[in-house]
A protein has these predicted regions:
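Predominantly soluble domains enriched in secretory-pathway, periplasmic, or organellar proteins
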Residues: 1-299
């Protein structure tokens, strides 16, 4: 389904290394999958100190793995569960794995560095992985198609977008119990918080909008149309702007958070899918589904 590698670029956009996703799971104490297994990388998140990257794999391929995942899967349909990889950023090699659910997608590291959180698309769940041991400590059922995750600055709560519905789950990271922000809009996919944790922003893939939610009350306080199928987004370090990729509009929208006004729209190429703000140079990196990367300078 995906090309089996992780590519690492330096800040100048030069390719530093291509990391194959082939692993010998037995070397990490995993049984039932002898020989070499391959993954299918989807998303990555970094530890606070930048020493490690954690990478989800849409599916695994090799001995002991069954049907590969698909976006049309259902919980309990037999889709094989997958693994989270840990990449050592000094050696640029995979040095740890953790078993998670079926078709893991988004990855987030809690600011206190205790957990790595993984949304399991086909298991309808959130995997909570202990970062120190690289072991799943709990799998929290959520409902169809969990996707984006963001964690509060104090690591007390995680917000999870449930793309198969209209809601956002709120996970208490101390008790690992679930609450809800209901009816934010159709197909919530990606989430970001402002630096204070006061406002939550969600892309609505189905509605073509971004919504702003007051986290204290769980109330939607604003919304803006950004384009067709807004997928991923990021927020500027000062919290004043959002950067949203619109998959079917083939562009990036810059949104002012104070009043949710679209201040700029930039063409990107066909099907922009991922985006991140690089704060040391004030640049926005955009991943295109066809395999290209577009780097924009923020003004």
């Amino acid at each position: 389904m995906y090309q089996h590698s992780v590519t690492v670029y330096d800040a100048d956009g030069n390719l530093a290394k291509t990391i194959p996703d082939s692993v010998d799971l037995t070397a990490f104490g995993v049984t039932g999958h002898p020989g070499i297994s391959k993954g299918a990388p989807v998303e990555a998140a970094y530890s606070k100190d930048g020493r490690f990257a954690y990478v989800s794999n849409y599916s695994m391929y090799g001995a002991g793995f069954g049907p590969e995942g698909s976006d049309e899967c259902r919980a309990g349909d037999g889709t094989s569960e997958s693994f989270l990889y840990r990449i050592n950023m000094s050696t640029l090699a995979i040095d740890g794995v953790a078993a998670v659910g079926a078709v893991p997608k988004y990855v987030a590291v809690t600011p206190d560095q205790r957990y790595v959180l993984v949304s399991d698309w086909c298991s309808y769940a959130l995997s909570v992985v202990d970062r120190a041991s690289m072991r799943e400590v709990k799998r929290i059922p959520l409902g169809p198609y969990p996707r984006g995750i963001v964690v509060s600055p104090d690591s007390s709560k995680a917000y999870v977008a449930i793309m198969g519905g209209r809601d956002v789950a709120v996970i208490d990271l101390r008790s690992l119990t679930t609450g809800w922000i209901r009816n934010v809009g159709g197909g919530p996919r990606h989430l970001v918080l402002d630096p204070t944790g006061r406002y939550l922003y969600a892309t609505l893939n189905k509605d073509g909008q971004v919504v702003k939610v007051d986290t204290a009350s769980g109330t939607v306080v604003g919304r803006v149309a950004t384009g067709n199928q807004p997928r991923s987004m990021d927020i500027s370090p000062d919290g004043t702007a959002l950067y949203v990729v619109n998959y079917e509009s083939n562009n990036v929208a810059k949104v002012r958070t104070a009043d949710l006004a679209v201040t700029q729209t930039i063409p990107t190429g066909v099907h922009p899918i991922g985006i991140t703000y690089e704060p040391t140079r004030d640049r926005v990196w955009v991943a295109i589904y066809t395999g290209a990367i577009v780097v924009l300078t923020d003004a």
